[in-house]
From Swiss-Prot:
Transmembrane spans: 11-31, 42-62, 80-100, 104-124, 136-156, 186-206, 218-238, 244-264, 290-310, 311-331
Pfam families: EamA
Bilayer topology annotation: Multi-pass membrane protein
InterPro entries to which the protein is assigned, alphabetical: EamA_dom, WAT1-related
GO MF terms, alphabetically ordered: transmembrane transporter activity
Family affiliation: Belongs to the drug/metabolite transporter (DMT) superfamily. Plant drug/metabolite exporter (P-DME) (TC 2.A.7.4) family.
Organism: Arabidopsis thaliana (Mouse-ear cress)
Keywords: Membrane, Transmembrane, Transmembrane helix
Top-level taxon of the source organism: Eukaryota
PANTHER family, per database record: WAT1-RELATED PROTEIN
Designated name of the protein: WAT1-related protein At3g28130
Primary location group: membrane
Domain EamA intervals: 29-154
Compartments, as annotated in UniProt: Membrane
């Protein structure tokens, strides 16, 4: 019965993670389109994160009252504060990087996350690296295969496999036409995105640590959003002190982007914390290579972009790597469950002997 419950939880978690990664690609595309209409990165982050804090406030109160949780100590709050500082830094560099480049490059560079996260998880003993265990080998091989697949999608186009006769949504394609960037902007954007995707794995590890101390995703998300919005506000006010007009929001795609971000980001972050709590940081990071495949598929479906052989081959490799890691995580979870089941009767016998 317990194994069935675990399988259901894993299925729900997998579905939620796929949905959030798809939503994240769409959010990045919407943000890039909004920047072409004058939206500033600081404006988006500050307003959307303030909205996110308000959205999370009721769930934080409900979660705090309805569950038996350890006290929210100053030490835990300080760690959430450090997480907020990390988040503010990689959010600012990430969105400014997208502003200079485009969402596809952001998805491509984010593929360094699994490798860095896996290395950090081994260093902090959150993951095992043993060539004697099939689950560990599967996770390592799957991570490498996913990274290779992502590189194939980015670096190799090949011949066209599929070309739509006309874009399904011509108005949307027209809106997203200004998303191209110059070569110099592309390099600046790439450097900023690389900094962001070096900090993200560090945040994943810290999230896992905080979830062990205080397993309440909505409460941690609320304080994270609150701290990140305050820190981003301070940085934004200093950085844009000579440009006060950026704080004025117009009733167009810029407002839509801010509101959608304020609603989407809290759920996105809470699901990430839930995934880290139940599966660890590597599970969270392995979904990043899927983002480049999702971006290619969404471009073909909604914008009428051509689908190339490189995208097909890379997509197959990403899928193989992803499912290999999932198999490794499932086998690891099954082994832990069986060992726990074996230990429980022994524990009961020891208690009976003592009585």
């Amino acid at each position: 019965m317990a194994s069935i419950t675990l399988r259901r939880r894993d299925a729900v978690l997998l579905t939620a993670m796929l949905a959030t990664e798809t939503g994240n690609v769409a959010m990045n595309t919407l943000f890039k389109a909004a920047t072409s209409k004058g939206l500033n990165s600081y404006t988006f982050l500050i307003y959307s994160y303030l909205i996110g804090s308000i959205v999370l406030l009721p769930s934080h109160i409900f979660s705090y009252r309805s569950r038996s949780l350890p006290s929210l100590s100053l030490s835990i709050l300080c760690k959430i504060g450090v997480l907020g500082l990390l988040g503010s830094t990689y959010l600012i560099t990430g969105f400014i990087g997208i502003e200079y480049s485009n969402p596809t490059l952001a998805s491509a560079i984010s593929n360094i996350n699994p490798a860095i996260t896996f290395i950090l998880a081994i260093i902090f003993r959150m993951e095992k690296a043993s060539f004697k265990e099939k689950s560990s080998v599967a996770k390592m091989v799957g991570t490498i295969v996913s990274l290779v697949g992502a590189l194939v999608v980015v670096l190799y186009h090949g011949p066209r496999v599929f070309t739509p006769s006309s874009p399904p949504f011509p108005q949307l394609r027209q809106l997203l036409l200004p998303l191209s960037s110059s070569n110099s902007d592309w390099i600046i954007g790439g450097c900023l995105l690389a900094i962001k995707d070096t900090l993200v794995p560090v945040a994943f590890i810290l999230q896992a640590h905080i979830m062990k101390l205080y397993p309440a995703p909505f409460t941690v998300s609320f304080f994270y959003f609150l701290i990140a919005s305050i820190l981003t506000s301070l940085i934004g006010i200093v950085a844009e002190k000579n440009n006060p007009s950026i704080w004025i929001i117009h009733f167009d795609i810029t407002l839509v982007c801010i509101v959608v971000g304020g609603i989407f980001n809290p759920g996105y972050y809470a699901i990430h914390l839930w995934a880290v709590r139940n599966k660890g940081p590597v599970y969270l990071a392995i979904f990043r290579p899927l983002s480049i495949l999702i971006a290619v598929i969404m471009g073909a479906i909604f914008l009428g972009d051509s689908f190339y052989l490189g995208s097909l081959v890379g997509g197959i490799l990403i899928s193989l790597g992803f499912y290999t890691v999932m198999w490794g995580k499932a086998k690891e979870g099954k082994t832990q469950f069986l060992s726990l089941s074996e230990e429980t009767p022994l524990l009961d016998e020891n208690i009976d002997d003592r009585i």
